[in-house]
Amino acid sequence: MTRFRLWFLAFALCAPALALRAADFDGSRPFVCALIEAHDCAPGVACTKGLAEDLKLPTFVRIDFQGRTFAARGRTSPIRNAQRVDGQLIFQGSENGRSFSVTVGETSGKLVGAVAGDGEAFVVFGACTLVP
């Protein structure tokens, strides 16, 4: 009986946290993402794979889905299109001759993004956490 009570108590304490975790990346709160791996691509050559910082990309980006902003290295770009689709936040924008498209998993916080410009493209993979 004591073992059952301990399991029940553990479940009762953890269940609210699990419910909150599932709603973490629903777009209601800003979050910060670490860009981990990136691929730098150009026509006619193989893509270069490396850490985002090695490819001179920002290490961190701040995303405010409600405020429709995407910020890195002191620069802020407007999010022109934002949607929640099948458990993912999806948003796009453009600035300085480049377009970006980013997807963040609502439950995982995993980020996949692409930036495209004239004869160049970057694909990035990262992980996000909520802003305290």
Listing of model-derived features with the role each one plays in the protein:
Residues 1-6:
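Positively charged n-region of N-terminal signal peptides that target proteins for export
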Residues 7-17:
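Bacterial N-terminal signal peptides
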Residues 18-22:
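Sec/Tat signal peptide C-region and signal peptidase I cleavage site
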Residues 27-66:
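Short, solvent-exposed loop/hinge segments that bridge or flank secondary-structure elements
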Residues 51, 118-132:
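Edge beta-strand at a domain terminus
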Residues 59-61, 99-106, 126-130:
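Hydrophobic/aromatic beta-strand elements that line small-molecule binding cavities or substrate pockets
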Residues 65-100:
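Contiguous, well-ordered beta-strand patches that form the walls/edges
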Residues 103, 111-123:
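Short, exposed beta-strand-loop hairpins at the edges of beta-sheets
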